[in-house]
Amino acid sequence: MITYACDAPGVYGALAIQPAADHKPGEMIEVGRLTEKDASPRGKIPQVAHTYRVLGLMNEHQLAVSESTFEGRPEAENPQGILGYGELMSLMLQRARTAREAIRVFTGLVSQYGYGDVGESISIADTREAWILEIVGSGRGGKGGVWVAVRIPDGQIACHANQSRIGEFPRSDPENCLYSENVESFAVSKGWYDPKAGRPFRFFEAYSPATPVKRRVCDTRVWSVLRRAAPSLRLSPDYHRGRPGAQPYPLSVVPDKKLSPGDVFALLRDHYEGTDFDMTKGVDAGPFGSPYRWRPLTWKLDGVQYAWERPFSTQQTGFSFVTQSRAWLPNPIGGLAWYGVDDTYTTCYLPLYCGMDALPKALSTGSLNKFSWDSAWWVFNVVSNYSHTKYSQMVPEVQAAQKNIESELLALQPAVEKTALELAKTDAKLMTSYLTDYSVSHVEQTTARWRTLAEYLFTKYRDGYVYNGKSEWKEVGYPEAWLRRVVHERPEQFRLPAEKPSEKK
């Protein structure tokens, strides 16, 4: 399994299917629109004879990819490189069947055409293996890129969150580690690593050194995932709090139990609840315990720099997913993406089989520029954004609906796949129709239920009252803890004079 949360205010959670295709000899494809400044492609590369079918970020062979950007050192960027990480991920899915093939596609193209983007961590999974590949550019005018790829051991969980995570790595174990020839020498040439200093070479130290901000907003997320997957390790918060001498977190750990898709959904839903960094606590959470902090993440006050906590669950998520790639099932059934739009905390993860041949309207219509009740992305945004106004009261109702839907879908999964397997034995087209109808219908049904939930919440929580559905409106006011803060800050502002005996009735 791999996961992804695409967190950016300009990301719309629409899906597309790219059909498999055969291509003519000599066919070229345009590449290299990496930034808004790239009005035209930076270059062209040859097309291959055949490209595989791709649904979102999973292809017909159950190969799945995801990413997080860590940027790295600006000096490593190469504006002459023509390939960016987004294009390279697409090309991996179109041209590779396994994770190792995907790494060869990625690094081969980088070697030939140059990497022109910022530092990236990329998760790659097939039915047998999971890898993390990290890459930076080779500097202005440089060739290729600088990269390392590490296989995550079976039975372990790894996490990366906008910060390079690969430290030391084995140089003579190609079954578990691959790297570019310049992975160390480039850092030495730039003065970012001194082999005579007596310290081992660590990729993240050379190419994306930790800063107080990175530790706070990136490594806290890593710590939170690993500590919840393996609480027995009792991982310390010292590193992400920037305490001297604290060591970085391991790239991967053995979880205390085997993780199910539902367990992984839970790992993606986090505001550090129950820790010293719980975002539902404190004056910054407001009267109703909201864990959401509007950007920017950092600010200065009286010359001192501060930073909000940055959790996995955040308001600007465009979409997220959890994939399953299973060798014991035929590809159309074994490849499954549990897909959700908007904030991970309030989304519903819905099953999309890689064998489906049509998309639900709710995930393939609309845009960022115009609201639509037909779009799942907009409907889920309505619910999440409105629930922010009285988080402690509304979000439990949202999560009750979420649990109801996801529990039902997880319970149905074995029977659905058993039926699909039986159909595959006699009629592959009927199997495809069955999986498509199942996935599409549940997306549309859930979107309709979420529209109803939006209407219900807006009716019940209105104008500061809570409506009980029987023409009665309850005054709920503010929590006592919040009222005490108000009085502490302005003790005389709201105090009423004591009643005089003559005024008492």
Model regions: which residues?
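Short, well-ordered beta-strand elements within core beta-sheets of diverse protein domains
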Residues: M89-R95
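Short, charged, surface-exposed loops that flank catalytic or proteolytic processing sites
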Residues: R95-E101
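Histidine-centered catalytic/metal-binding microenvironments
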Residues: E406-K505
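Substrate-recognition/cap regions that form aromatic- and gly/pro-loop-enriched pockets
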Residues: G286-L423
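Soluble extracytoplasmic regions of secretory-pathway and membrane proteins
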Residues: T3-A8, L133-I135, H271, D278-W294, ...
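A contiguous strand-loop segment
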Residues: M1-Y85, V105-L259
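Glycine-rich, aromatic-lined ligand/substrate-binding cores of catalytic
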Residues: S185-L336, G340
